[in-house]
UniProtKB/Swiss-Prot annotation:
One of its GO terms (cellular component) is plasma membrane. InterPro entries: AAA+_ATPase, ABC_SmlMolc_Importer, ABC_transporter-like_ATP-bd, ABC_transporter-like_CS, P-loop_NTPase, Thiamine_ABC_ThiQ. This is Thiamine import ATP-binding protein ThiQ. Residues 2-230 form the ABC transporter domain. The gene is thiQ. ATP binds at G32, P33, S34, G35, A36, G37, K38, S39. The lineage of its organism: Bacteria, Pseudomonadati, Pseudomonadota, Gammaproteobacteria, Enterobacterales. It comes from Salmonella paratyphi A (strain ATCC 9150 / SARB42). Coiled coil: none annotated.
Length: 235
C-alpha cells in the first residue's frame, strides 16, 4: 500500500532519509526522541514537505511529487485546525467540498461519519463551544469523510486526559480495521502505541533506527528500547 524508497529531505543540509513499506490495513506507530524526524516523515508522506530525492508509492502509484490535496492521504494534527467561524457540520463538510456545496450523497456521508463519531447532536455548534475531545472528534470526522486509504496521525490526542485518549485510540483503531485503512501514528508514548499498533518504527537522527513488534519495545527487549528510555524487565 505505502512504500518509501530512499525518500530524502535536507534539514540544514543534513539529510533525513527514510525507506519503509506498510501493507494495506496495517496500524503502525512511529516513535522516537524529540526532534528525531517523526513528524518530518509524516509530512513527507502527506506531501507538506518536498523530498530532495527518492520515491513514494501509494497503492503502486508514484505520488512523490503529487500535491497534498491530491494525495490519497488524510492527516490529523495535535492542533485540530478547525475553522472557528464554521459550525461542526460545515467543518466536516470541508472534507468533501471546500466550497461547502454538498450534494445529497455527500450530505449523507457527512451525517453518517458524524453519527459514527458520536457528534451528530453537535452539528450546529461552533468549535469554541466544544470540549477538546469533541473538537478532535470533529477533526477526525473531517479526515475520515474524505475516504482516503491512508490515515496519518501526528499526536492528535496527546493533550487529552488518559481515559479520553484511550477512548479515541480505540475508536480510530476500530474504524481503520472496519475500513481497512493504513494507519501511521506518531506518538511519544509506547503504551499508546501498544494499544492499537502491533508494529512500531523507531526514528532517530533522521533515520528509521528500528522496526518490529511494539510488544518487544515495551518489554525492553528490543535494541531500540533504550532510545525510548525503556529498560528490560528481565533480571
Amino acid at each position: 500500500m505505502l512504500k518509501l524508497i530512499d525518500i530524502t529531505w535536507l534539514y540544514h543540509h543534513l539529510p533525513m532519509r527514510f525507506t519503509l513499506a506498510v501493507e494495506r490495513g496495517e496500524q503502525v506507530a512511529i516513535l522516537g526522541p524529540s526532534g528525531a524526524g517523526k513528524s518530518t516523515l509524516l509530512n513527507l508522506i502527506a506531501g507538506f514537505l518536498a523530498p530532495a530525492s527518492g520515491t513514494l508509492l501509494i497503492a503502486g502509484e508514484d505520488h512523490t511529487l503529487t500535491p497534498p490535496s491530491r494525495r490519497p492521504v488524510s492527516m490529523l494534527f495535535q492542533e485540530n485546525n478547525l475553522f472557528s467561524h464554521l459550525n461542526v457540520q460545515q467543518n466536516i463538510g470541508l472534507g468533501l467540498n471546500p466550497g461547502l456545496t454538498l450534494n445529497a450523497s455527500q450530505r449523507e456521508k457527512r451525517d453518517a461519519i458524524a453519527r459514527q463519531m458520536g457528534i451528530e447532536s453537535l452539528m450546529t455548534r461552533l468549535p469554541g463551544e466544544l470540549s477538546g475531545g469533541q473538537r478532535q472528534r470533529v477533526a477526525l470526522a473531517r479526515c475520515l469523510v474524505r475516504e482516503q486509504p491512508v490515515l496519518l496521525l501526528d499526536e492528535p490526542f496527546s493533550a487529552l486526559d488518559p481515559a479520553l485518549r484511550q477512548e479515541m485510540l480505540t475508536l480510530v483503531s476500530d474504524i481503520c480495521r472496519e475500513r481497512q485503512l493504513t494507519l501511521l501514528m506518531v506518538s511519544h508514548s509506547v503504551e499508546d502505541a501498544a494499544r492499537i499498533a502491533p508494529r512500531s518504527i523507531v526514528v532517530a537522527d533522521g533515520r528509521i533506527a528500528w522496526q518490529g513488534k511494539t510488544d518487544e519495545l515495551l518489554s525492553g527487549q528490543a535494541s531500540a528500547s533504550a532510545l525510548l528510555g525503556i529498560k528490560s524487565h528481565i533480571l
